[in-house]
Amino acid sequence: TRAAYAGRQKYTFGWTGDSGCSDGVTKGWAQMENQIAVLLSAGLGLIPFTTTDISGYCGDIDDYPAMAELYVRWVQMGAFNPLSRIHHEGNNAVEPWMFGEQAEGYVKDAISLKYSLLPYIYSYAREAHDTGLPIMRAMFLEYPYDSQTFSTDNQFMFGEELLVAPVVK
């Protein structure tokens, strides 16, 4: 949902907004990295169910090969969001096969990984519902006595057990 209201944190999924990278692939990388901070901030604000536009909502794609790695990396990072949804603006699609056979294979692997994690995600979703503790966790939530975790902003814990360090450059 775009809107916020009392109880949102318990019953709905938030969305980080149109991240946009229509100025080119270079801006798209920065936007993907920025989404990590936005998602973690939402969790720290007791909104544990938040997601992003996987693929960056990047406008018309003129050069699929140039966009392929960013698309794959965004899908891989998005597999570790509480909700994964590929969403795009513009007049063309962002289906995995449009980025080439190799990209399609990587995306298939990321989606398969997400499905294999569903029992894990369900357990942490229940915990989030009951306690407000987010599934995507800033490093310092799990390691509060490690001062380096307070300046780590491009990786996160997914639940207690999984460290996620997306490729963002």
What positions do the PLM features span?
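Catalytic-domain carbohydrate-binding cleft regions of carbohydrate-active enzymes
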Residues: 1-169
